[in-house]
């Protein structure tokens, strides 16, 4: 503080102190009185600022609260029973009598629990998303993108699968443990000196994919114990009563109170680690505290309604967009309150919209999370285009490629891999729920086998060849996409192309009722092509880098999965289980007819690739070099992408959606033989066929007679590899 002194050596009042004195102060009043008046005015200034901030917050929250109340009343009017607004009001006030008294039971036992569940889930996810975005200083962070929802859902499914019956409150504890472990793993893997928003979200999204694969395994292995969890897993507000919601409301209220109480610490964390430490805040300890609170909120939401997608991303992000109009939202207490209100508004609004579009009867069976996932996927893709990624643009070219042996003897290495594939095919034919001998196969080929052996091999051999052809197709598609986009993270599954193909196939079956294999194939190709055009069109116009393109693909996968769920919940349980098995990536039920499209696709695209392999070598470098050497980059890229889409559609219709295979196989081939596509593509195809054939054999054998879809095994293998690849690619 600067001290002003007079020439007589006395301490003078700070400049302007007299002006700060209240009106009416006598001119001859002592200097101490003037100083006291100035201090009082200075102390009153922060109170005035806080009052104005509270007023602005009230002006914002009041309209949102009013709209939420009106939306809640509209929500109560929707349902399978036709009730007038007057009857709803009388039921709420307890004035219904006589023959109309049953309307009161409808409101109290069915509609109010659904409404309260939506309000609680939306508020909980809004709170959780706001906290996660604040402590990570990452606008893309949410319970979905950090794997918290997936961890909580997996934990609850595991408990149900093994027959453990828990009270509602204890289930929330299980969800909390699963969500906390997932969030801790994501944050531990993605933080550090080279962290970035995209890195963290990619790590969380891929871990969520891995956990989803494990959850799908449990749903398939224990269909009776986990009955009803499929629709619930997409985020369903259907409730058996209001007691479960009431049980968890104190937990949610306690978490919200803790956030309001410690809001100043959360404000300090926004200043950065160094600034917060200088203010006396123990950064790591308080980040851990707030992480626990966020996971508690998510656990409450997942226990009530399952993982409702992307509400925790959209609500805080929408709140931050209002900061320009309401500066008080920079305070975490204000942001948390508004995020909770907007979260509840989004969930109730999605439920109202869904039942308005689909009708009350169908709206009850469709999970609300389907609508929020579609909206949130668009939101995530939009945010991904503006976020900092932290990845180099030329990381595919600069990554290590080729071994000494592979570079010197590429043809010999390809021959060895082909021989290994033949051996694996022979072994795969022999293993499964019934072990066979080589003589059994010989007898079958010469029409001398028993009826039992004929039945086994007539179903097993097409499966083996479907795995070989599917792995070869997806691996080639992955190598093409990585070369065309110069993106080491590119994969048909990760980019959403496989999910879109599956959505197209399911739409053809459910909507049109067709059973024609070729019609379903055309629908799958249409879905894959639509996503490919959108993804690569946006990339060409906006210059998406590696990580942003992958994140956009993940958001497309989420939207496609939501649409697929929307269609599947209307099918019977038998077809639902069959569809889940196929969507998980299984060769179950494959026939020779289903292998034919893959054979055609491989032959045609193989001929094209052999002609343009040199051009692909140049395209993977940059855009300038191939143009200088006379290569038409746009035309070459279009032809190659078309080849990849055809391969993905043919493989998806035969073996379902299989993620990470198109990522792992090209990288393994590149490490062995180098970047020259004349040798890289054949080896990639062989390695892809090898991997999927082994995965299929493992899935048919380890828990026989039950089976694990091959796609789930490749997901469990590919998820750690993707995380390792992210770690290698961080900016140095």
Task: State what each model feature region is.
Residues 2-16, 20-25, 40-732:
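Alpha-helical transmembrane segments in inner-membrane proteins
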């Amino acid at each position: 503080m600067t001290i002003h002194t007079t020439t007589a050596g006395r301490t003078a009042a700070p400049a302007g102190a007299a002006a700060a004195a209240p009106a009416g102060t006598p001119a001859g009043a002592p200097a101490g009185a003037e100083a006291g008046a100035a201090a009082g005015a200075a102390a009153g200034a922060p109170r005035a600022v806080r009052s104005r901030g509270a007023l602005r917050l009230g002006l914002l929250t009041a309209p949102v609260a009013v709209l939420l109340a009106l939306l809640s009343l509209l929500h109560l009017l929707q349902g399978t029973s036709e009730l007038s607004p007057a009857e709803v009001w009388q039921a709420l006030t307890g004035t219904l009598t006589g023959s109309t008294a049953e309307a009161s039971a409808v409101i109290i036992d069915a509609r109010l629990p659904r409404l309260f569940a939506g309000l609680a889930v939306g508020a909980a996810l809004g709170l959780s998303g706001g906290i996660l975005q604040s402590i990570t200083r990452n606008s893309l962070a949410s319970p979905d993108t950090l794997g918290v929802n997936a961890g909580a859902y997996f934990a609850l499914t595991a408990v149900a699968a093994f027959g453990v019956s828990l009270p509602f409150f204890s289930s929330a504890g299980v969800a909390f443990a699963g969500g906390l472990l997932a969030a801790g793993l994501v944050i531990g893997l993605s933080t550090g000196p080279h962290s970035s928003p995209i890195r963290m979200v990619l790590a969380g999204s891929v871990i969520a994919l891995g956990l989803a694969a494990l959850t799908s395994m449990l749903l398939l292995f224990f269909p009776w114990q986990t009955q009803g969890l499929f629709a619930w897993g997409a985020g369903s507000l259907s409730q058996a009563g209001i007691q479960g919601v009431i049980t968890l409301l104190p937990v949610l209220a306690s978490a919200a109170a803790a956030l309001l109480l410690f809001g100043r610490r959360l404000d300090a964390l926004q200043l950065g680690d160094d600034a917060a430490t200088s203010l006396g805040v123990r950064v790591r300890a308080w980040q851990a505290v707030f992480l626990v609170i966020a996971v508690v909120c998510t656990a409450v939401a997942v226990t009530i309604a399952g993982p409702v997608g992307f509400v925790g991303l959209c609500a805080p992000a929408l709140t931050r967009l209002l900061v320009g109009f309401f500066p008080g939202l920079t305070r975490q207490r204000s942001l948390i309150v508004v995020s909770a209100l907007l979260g509840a508004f989004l969930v109730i609004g999605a439920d109202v919209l869904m039942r308005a579009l689909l009708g009350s009867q169908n709206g009850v069976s469709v999970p609300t999370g389907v609508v929020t996932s579609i909206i949130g996927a668009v939101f995530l893709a939009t945010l991904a285009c503006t976020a900092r990624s932290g990845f180099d643009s030329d990381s595919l070219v600069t990554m290590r490629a080729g071994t000494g042996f592979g570079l010197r003897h590429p043809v010999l290495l390809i021959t060895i891999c082909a021989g290994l594939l033949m051996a694996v095919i022979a072994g795969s034919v022999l293993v499964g729920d019934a072990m066979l001998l080589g003589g059994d196969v010989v007898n079958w080929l010469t029409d001398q086998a028993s009826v039992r052996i004929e039945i086994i091999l007539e179903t097993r051999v097409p499966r083996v060849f479907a795995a070989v052809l599917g792995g070869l197709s997806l691996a080639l598609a992955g190598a093409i996409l990585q070369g065309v986009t110069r993106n080491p993270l590119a994969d048909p599954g990760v980019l959403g192309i496989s999910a879109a193909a599956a959505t197209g196939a399911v739409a053809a079956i459910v909507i049109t009722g067709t059973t024609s294999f070729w019609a379903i194939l055309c629908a799958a190709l249409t879905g894959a092509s639509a996503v490919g055009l959108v993804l690569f069109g946006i990339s060409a116009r906006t210059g998406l880098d590696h990580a942003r393109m992958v994140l956009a693909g993940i958001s497309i996968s989420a939207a496609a999965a939501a649409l697929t769920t929307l269609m599947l919940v209307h099918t019977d349980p038998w077809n639902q289980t069959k569809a889940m098995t196929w969507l998980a990536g299984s060769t179950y039920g494959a026939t020779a007819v289903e292998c034919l499209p893959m054979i055609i696709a491989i032959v045609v695209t193989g001929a094209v690739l052999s002609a343009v392999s040199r051009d692909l070598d140049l395209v993977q470098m940059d855009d300038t070099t191939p143009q200088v050497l006379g290569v038409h980059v746009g035309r070459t890229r279009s032809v190659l992408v078309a080849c990849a889409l055809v391969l993905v559609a043919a493989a998806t219709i035969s073996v379902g959606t299989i993620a990470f295979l198109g990522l792992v196989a090209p990288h393994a081939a590149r490490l062995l033989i180098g970047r020259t596509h004349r040798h890289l593509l054949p080896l990639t195809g062989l390695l892809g066929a090898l991997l999927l054939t082994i995965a299929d054999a493992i899935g048919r054998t380890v828990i026989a007679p039950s089976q694990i879809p091959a796609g789930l095994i490749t997901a469990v293998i590919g998820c750690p590899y993707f995380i390792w690849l992210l770690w290698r690619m961080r900016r140095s």
